[in-house]
Curated annotation (Swiss-Prot):
EC number: 5.4.99.-
Gene3D superfamilies, per the entry: Pseudouridine synthase, PUA domain
InterPro entries noted in UniProt: Dyskerin-like, PsdUridine_synth_cat_dom_sf, PsdUridine_synth_N, PUA, PUA-like_sf, PUA_sf, tRNA_PsdUridine_synth_B_fam, TruB_C
Active-site residue list: 113
Protein name, UniProt field: Putative H/ACA ribonucleoprotein complex subunit 4
Presence of the UniProt keyword RNA-binding in the record: yes
PUA domain ranges (all copies): 284-359
Source species, domain of life: Eukaryota
Protein's cellular compartments: Nucleus, Nucleolus
Organism: Caenorhabditis briggsae
Length: 445
């Protein structure tokens, strides 16, 4: 017997002794295992800190985590944080990317002038549905300005920049693609960085509302200082939640990634530069719904209490929220109809109404129309007892016509009644006024 056999035999004996001495059992406990979701991606981050309404639902095989989509869907559900080069316009850059990627649609998060460089969020295919929401997000610029005359002290420049904050009147510059009418735009902060008296040039950082013209701010700065001024260079270093330090890519990256995908079948470069659309929604309050109601929401259904699994704190009525699946996919952007405290305390009602559906229809299976009444209605349509739209015809049994209530018909009748009441209201008021006049005239006589 060799050394190896002895060793294995000894290990076996030790294992047997340990099994006899120890009690290998899972003790019963009321404590639930702690789940650390702080490192989970995108919308699933801090999932364990969401308020739980219920954990009972049937998981569906359909759907997939945003980071595990196949490459075709990954690209069509993604966006770039592009470093726009100086000279080409935003529309030119977007059309070039459309041609490189051979996709159906592209959009961007807000136009940059041809000479301006920096952050430009380029949305691809399905992500273009979020382009409008990103256009309204806040922007941050770094600007180089030039004054036409010398200024005694750079503190005056700093004070003038501080005056140009808050709500400002602006008229678009002469070279602009919009109507030149007076408008109000909010500048949140103008941070003075540097001023060179020899060249009469300075740098400042501007955090402002979308649609603000930094060129106009430079002109106003010159007017306040009494010497005139103009913008020399401009770079956008933040657009919405994307800034220049976070996954910024160039046009060369896009071209190289597509080349690697076409020739080498290498997806890694493309997955590195393209980010899932869910990354644009990480600042929204979240509501997680059951898999069974996902497709209904894609077809325009309202989000009701029975379909809710988890929800965020501090949800306010009328604010935008994101409706998501248990796998972390964004279904739609919705307008909240209930606050967090209301959701926690009620057992029925409308939580939110969808504003913009993001997910395609029929990704998840249909789970409505499976009840006894709906099944009976489908059978009657097959048998010819109802027309193809499910409405009564000559052959429809009288019992069905009495029992079945068409909600759209009832709603229409209610709307007609309300319209009639609105029309009759001024007539009633005029009659009452006429009666009062008659009674007052009789009293005077």
């Amino acid at each position: 017997m060799g050394k190896k056999d002895k060793r294995s035999k000894l290990e076996g004996d030790e294992l047997a002794e340990a099994q006899q001495k120890g009690s290998f059992q899972l003790p019963s406990s009321n404590e639930t295992a702690k789940l650390d979701a702080s490192q989970w991606p995108l919308l699933l981050k801090n999932y364990d800190k969401l308020n739980v309404r219920t954990n009972h639902y049937t998981p569906h095989v359909e759907g997939v985590s945003p980071l595990k989509r196949d490459i075709k869907n990954y690209i069509s559900s993604g966006f770039f944080n592009l470093d726009k080069p100086s000279n080409p316009s935003s529309h030119e850059v977007v059309s070039w990317i459309k041609r490189i990627l051979r996709c159906e649609k592209t959009g961007h998060s807000g136009t940059l002038d041809p000479k301006v460089s920096g952050c430009l969020i380029v949305c691809i295919d399905r992500t273009t549905r979020l382009a409008k929401s990103q256009q309204g997000a806040g922007k941050e610029y770094i600007c180089i300005f030039k004054l036409h005359e010398e200024v005694e002290d750079e503190r005056k420049v700093k004070q003038a920049l501080e005056k140009l904050t808050g709500a400002l009147f602006q008229r678009p510059p002469l070279i602009s693609a919009v109507k030149r009418q007076l408008r109000i735009r909010t500048v949140y902060e103008n941070k003075f960085i540097e001023y060179d008296p020899a060249q009469q040039m300075g740098i400042f950082n501007c955090i402002c509302e979308s649609g603000t013209y930094v060129r106009t701010i430079c002109v106003h700065l010159g007017l306040i200082l009494g010497c005139g001024g103009q913008m020399q260079e401009l770079r956008r270093n933040r657009s919405g939640i994307c800034d220049e330090n976070e996954n910024m890519v160039t046009m060369h990256d896009v071209l190289d990634a597509q080349y690697m995908l076409d020739t080498q079948k290498d997806e890694s470069y493309m997955r590195h530069i393209v980010r899932p659309l869910e990354a644009l929604l990480t600042q929204h309050k979240r509501v997680v719904v059951k898999d069974s109601c996902v497709n209904a929401i894609c077809y325009g259904a309202k989000i009701l209490i029975p379909g809710i699994l988890r929800y965020d704190d501090d949800i306010e009525v009328g604010k935008e929220i994101v409706i998501m699946t248990t796998k972390g996919e964004a279904i739609c952007i919705a307008i909240a109809q209930m606050s967090t405290s209301t959701i926690a305390s009620v057992d029925h009602g409308i939580v939110a109404k969808s504003k913009r559906v993001i997910m395609e229809r029929d990704v998840y299976g249909r789970k409505w129309g499976l009840g006894p009444v709906a099944s009976k209605k489908k059978q009657m349509v097959k048998d010819g007892l109802l027309d193809k739209f499910g409405k009564p015809n000559i052959t429809t049994p009288k019992s069905w016509a009495k029992e079945y209530v068409q909600t759209d018909k009832v709603k229409k009748e209610q709307e007609d009644k309300e319209d009639e009441e609105e029309e009759e209201a001024p007539k009633k008021k005029s009659k009452k006024a006429a009666k009062k006049e008659v009674s007052s005239s009789s009293d005077s006589e």
